[in-house]
Amino acid sequence: MLSLSKPLQEFYRLDKCLSKHGTRFEFVNDKEIICSPDESNTHTFVILEGVVSLVRGDKVLIGIVQAPFIFGLADGVAKKEAQYKLIAESGCIGYRLSSSQTLAIIEQNQLWREAFCWIVWKSQVLELRDKQLIGNNSYDQIRATLMTMIEWDEELRSRIGVMNYIHQRTRVSRSVVAEVLAALRKGNYIEMNKGKLISINRLPSEY
Protein backbone atom coordinates (compact mmCIF):
# COMPACT_ATOMS: atom_id res chain seq x y z
CA MET A 1 0.00 0.00 0.00
CA LEU A 2 1.18 3.47 -0.81
CA SER A 3 0.45 6.90 0.56
CA LEU A 4 -1.37 8.15 -2.54
CA SER A 5 -5.02 8.73 -1.73
CA LYS A 6 -7.32 6.09 -3.20
CA PRO A 7 -10.22 7.62 -5.20
CA LEU A 8 -12.94 6.17 -2.99
CA GLN A 9 -15.90 8.18 -4.27
CA GLU A 10 -15.12 7.06 -7.81
CA PHE A 11 -14.78 3.47 -6.59
CA TYR A 12 -18.21 3.55 -4.93
CA ARG A 13 -19.87 4.87 -8.09
CA LEU A 14 -18.22 2.14 -10.17
CA ASP A 15 -19.09 -0.52 -7.60
CA LYS A 16 -22.74 0.56 -7.48
CA CYS A 17 -23.15 -0.31 -11.17
CA LEU A 18 -20.70 -3.18 -11.55
CA SER A 19 -21.90 -5.10 -8.48
CA LYS A 20 -25.35 -5.65 -9.99
CA HIS A 21 -23.80 -7.88 -12.65
CA GLY A 22 -20.91 -9.52 -10.80
CA THR A 23 -20.51 -13.06 -9.52
CA ARG A 24 -19.68 -12.89 -5.83
CA PHE A 25 -16.87 -14.82 -4.16
CA GLU A 26 -15.62 -15.26 -0.62
CA PHE A 27 -12.28 -16.69 0.50
CA VAL A 28 -11.86 -17.62 4.13
CA ASN A 29 -8.26 -18.83 4.13
CA ASP A 30 -5.01 -17.01 3.43
CA LYS A 31 -3.04 -17.69 0.23
CA GLU A 32 -6.05 -18.76 -1.83
CA ILE A 33 -5.83 -17.73 -5.48
CA ILE A 34 -8.60 -15.28 -6.37
CA CYS A 35 -7.50 -14.66 -9.95
CA SER A 36 -5.36 -17.10 -11.95
CA PRO A 37 -2.94 -15.92 -14.69
CA ASP A 38 -5.35 -17.18 -17.37
CA GLU A 39 -8.14 -15.00 -15.98
CA SER A 40 -6.07 -11.84 -15.47
CA ASN A 41 -6.70 -10.54 -19.00
CA THR A 42 -10.35 -11.56 -19.33
CA HIS A 43 -12.04 -10.53 -16.08
CA THR A 44 -12.44 -7.60 -13.72
CA PHE A 45 -12.13 -8.38 -10.01
CA VAL A 46 -13.57 -6.08 -7.35
CA ILE A 47 -12.32 -6.59 -3.78
CA LEU A 48 -14.81 -5.34 -1.18
CA GLU A 49 -13.23 -6.70 2.01
CA GLY A 50 -9.81 -8.06 2.88
CA VAL A 51 -6.21 -7.85 1.74
CA VAL A 52 -4.79 -9.21 -1.51
CA SER A 53 -1.36 -9.49 -3.08
CA LEU A 54 -0.73 -8.93 -6.78
CA VAL A 55 1.95 -11.22 -8.23
CA ARG A 56 3.29 -10.98 -11.79
CA GLY A 57 3.80 -14.12 -13.85
CA ASP A 58 7.56 -14.09 -13.22
CA LYS A 59 6.80 -14.34 -9.48
CA VAL A 60 7.59 -10.70 -8.74
CA LEU A 61 5.35 -9.32 -6.01
CA ILE A 62 3.92 -6.07 -7.33
CA GLY A 63 2.33 -5.13 -4.05
CA ILE A 64 -0.20 -5.79 -1.31
CA VAL A 65 -3.44 -3.82 -1.26
CA GLN A 66 -6.34 -3.46 1.13
CA ALA A 67 -9.96 -3.30 0.01
CA PRO A 68 -11.59 -1.62 -1.72
CA PHE A 69 -9.73 -2.39 -4.93
CA ILE A 70 -10.49 -3.01 -8.62
CA PHE A 71 -8.21 -5.17 -10.74
CA GLY A 72 -8.54 -5.40 -14.53
CA LEU A 73 -10.74 -2.35 -15.05
CA ALA A 74 -9.14 -1.44 -18.40
CA ASP A 75 -8.80 -4.93 -19.87
CA GLY A 76 -11.88 -4.53 -22.02
CA VAL A 77 -9.96 -1.83 -23.92
CA ALA A 78 -6.35 -3.04 -23.79
CA LYS A 79 -5.05 -6.40 -22.63
CA LYS A 80 -2.11 -6.53 -20.23
CA GLU A 81 1.17 -7.80 -21.66
CA ALA A 82 2.00 -9.75 -18.51
CA GLN A 83 -0.13 -12.23 -16.60
CA TYR A 84 -0.91 -11.79 -12.92
CA LYS A 85 -2.30 -13.63 -9.92
CA LEU A 86 -4.42 -12.14 -7.16
CA ILE A 87 -3.89 -13.98 -3.88
CA ALA A 88 -5.91 -13.55 -0.69
CA GLU A 89 -3.77 -12.49 2.27
CA SER A 90 -6.75 -12.56 4.65
CA GLY A 91 -10.44 -13.36 4.52
CA CYS A 92 -11.62 -11.77 1.30
CA ILE A 93 -15.00 -10.86 -0.22
CA GLY A 94 -15.66 -9.47 -3.68
CA TYR A 95 -17.06 -10.22 -7.10
CA ARG A 96 -15.94 -10.75 -10.68
CA LEU A 97 -17.30 -10.09 -14.14
CA SER A 98 -15.95 -10.34 -17.67
CA SER A 99 -13.84 -7.47 -19.00
CA SER A 100 -16.22 -6.99 -21.93
CA GLN A 101 -19.17 -6.72 -19.54
CA THR A 102 -17.27 -4.18 -17.44
CA LEU A 103 -16.63 -2.06 -20.53
CA ALA A 104 -20.29 -2.22 -21.56
CA ILE A 105 -21.46 -1.16 -18.07
CA ILE A 106 -19.03 1.77 -18.02
CA GLU A 107 -20.31 2.89 -21.43
CA GLN A 108 -23.97 2.42 -20.54
CA ASN A 109 -23.68 4.39 -17.29
CA GLN A 110 -21.18 6.96 -18.56
CA LEU A 111 -18.63 6.09 -15.89
CA TRP A 112 -15.61 7.03 -17.98
CA ARG A 113 -14.52 9.76 -15.58
CA GLU A 114 -14.67 7.38 -12.62
CA ALA A 115 -12.79 4.68 -14.53
CA PHE A 116 -10.18 7.21 -15.63
CA CYS A 117 -9.62 8.41 -12.05
CA TRP A 118 -9.15 4.84 -10.83
CA ILE A 119 -6.71 3.94 -13.63
CA VAL A 120 -4.71 7.13 -13.08
CA TRP A 121 -4.46 6.37 -9.36
CA LYS A 122 -3.21 2.86 -10.08
CA SER A 123 -0.66 4.25 -12.55
CA GLN A 124 0.59 6.67 -9.89
CA VAL A 125 0.96 3.80 -7.42
CA LEU A 126 3.00 1.80 -9.93
CA GLU A 127 5.08 4.87 -10.79
CA LEU A 128 5.93 5.34 -7.12
CA ARG A 129 6.86 1.66 -6.86
CA ASP A 130 9.18 2.01 -9.87
CA LYS A 131 10.75 5.12 -8.36
CA GLN A 132 11.48 3.18 -5.17
CA LEU A 133 13.01 0.16 -6.91
CA ILE A 134 14.37 0.85 -10.39
CA GLY A 135 17.95 2.07 -10.56
CA ASN A 136 18.45 1.94 -6.79
CA ASN A 137 20.94 -0.20 -4.93
CA SER A 138 19.87 -3.08 -2.69
CA TYR A 139 19.83 -1.06 0.52
CA ASP A 140 17.77 1.75 -1.02
CA GLN A 141 15.21 -0.81 -2.20
CA ILE A 142 15.07 -2.45 1.22
CA ARG A 143 14.78 0.93 2.93
CA ALA A 144 11.96 2.06 0.63
CA THR A 145 10.09 -1.19 1.19
CA LEU A 146 10.38 -0.89 4.97
CA MET A 147 9.00 2.65 4.75
CA THR A 148 6.08 1.31 2.73
CA MET A 149 5.40 -1.46 5.25
CA ILE A 150 5.38 0.86 8.25
CA GLU A 151 2.43 2.71 6.68
CA TRP A 152 0.34 -0.45 6.90
CA ASP A 153 -1.97 -0.91 9.85
CA GLU A 154 -0.78 -3.11 12.70
CA GLU A 155 -3.00 -6.05 11.77
CA LEU A 156 -1.58 -6.27 8.26
CA ARG A 157 2.02 -5.98 9.47
CA SER A 158 1.34 -8.85 11.87
CA ARG A 159 0.46 -11.07 8.90
CA ILE A 160 3.34 -10.32 6.53
CA GLY A 161 6.90 -11.52 7.11
CA VAL A 162 9.40 -8.75 6.48
CA MET A 163 12.13 -10.78 4.80
CA ASN A 164 9.83 -12.66 2.43
CA TYR A 165 7.97 -9.52 1.44
CA ILE A 166 11.15 -7.55 0.72
CA HIS A 167 12.67 -10.44 -1.25
CA GLN A 168 9.54 -11.03 -3.33
CA ARG A 169 9.02 -7.33 -4.02
CA THR A 170 12.63 -6.37 -4.83
CA ARG A 171 14.25 -9.70 -5.83
CA VAL A 172 17.21 -8.76 -3.62
CA SER A 173 18.69 -12.04 -2.38
CA ARG A 174 17.47 -13.40 0.93
CA SER A 175 21.00 -13.38 2.33
CA VAL A 176 21.43 -9.66 1.61
CA VAL A 177 17.98 -8.84 3.02
CA ALA A 178 18.73 -10.85 6.16
CA GLU A 179 22.11 -9.12 6.59
CA VAL A 180 20.61 -5.63 6.27
CA LEU A 181 17.70 -6.39 8.60
CA ALA A 182 20.06 -7.83 11.21
CA ALA A 183 22.23 -4.69 11.06
CA LEU A 184 19.22 -2.39 11.34
CA ARG A 185 17.91 -4.32 14.34
CA LYS A 186 21.32 -4.31 15.99
CA GLY A 187 21.58 -0.55 15.51
CA ASN A 188 18.09 -0.11 17.00
CA TYR A 189 16.85 1.43 13.77
CA ILE A 190 13.93 -1.00 13.50
CA GLU A 191 12.05 -3.29 15.86
CA MET A 192 10.85 -6.72 14.73
CA ASN A 193 9.14 -9.60 16.48
CA LYS A 194 8.89 -13.12 15.03
CA GLY A 195 9.86 -11.80 11.62
CA LYS A 196 7.20 -9.07 11.58
CA LEU A 197 7.86 -5.32 11.51
CA ILE A 198 6.83 -3.59 14.74
CA SER A 199 8.26 -0.09 14.41
CA ILE A 200 10.87 2.09 12.74
CA ASN A 201 12.87 4.51 14.84
CA ARG A 202 14.71 5.94 11.87
CA LEU A 203 16.47 4.54 8.81
CA PRO A 204 19.94 5.72 7.80
CA SER A 205 20.11 7.08 4.25
CA GLU A 206 23.14 4.91 3.49
CA TYR A 207 24.25 1.44 4.52
Curated annotation (Swiss-Prot):
Q: Please name the InterPro entries in this protein's record.
A: cNMP-bd_dom, cNMP-bd_dom_sf, HTH_46, IprA, RmlC-like_jellyroll
Record-linked Pfam families:
HTH_46
Record has Mitochondrion as a keyword: no
Q: Please list which residues make up the signal peptide.
A: none
Which keywords does UniProt give here?
Answer: Stress response
Note the DNA-binding span(s) on this chain.
163-182
Explain the consequences of disrupting this gene: Deletion mutants display increased resistance to oxidative stress, increased catalase activity and increased survival in macrophage cells. Deletion results in the altered expression of 82 and 56 genes in log and stationary phase, respectively.
Q: Name one GO biological process term.
A: response to oxidative stress
Superkingdom per UniProt: Bacteria
GO MF terms, alphabetically ordered: DNA-binding transcription factor activity
Record-level GO cellular component terms = cytosol
Q: Which family does it belong to?
A: Belongs to the IprA family.
Function in brief: Involved in oxidative stress resistance.
> Record's domain comment?
Deletion of the N- or the C-terminal 10 amino acids abolishes activity, while a region that includes amino acids 56 to 80 is dispensable for activity. Contains a predicted HTH motif, which may bind DNA.
- Please give the name of this protein: Inhibitor of hydrogen peroxide resistance
Organism of origin: Salmonella typhimurium (strain LT2 / SGSC1412 / ATCC 700720)
The gene behind this protein is iprA
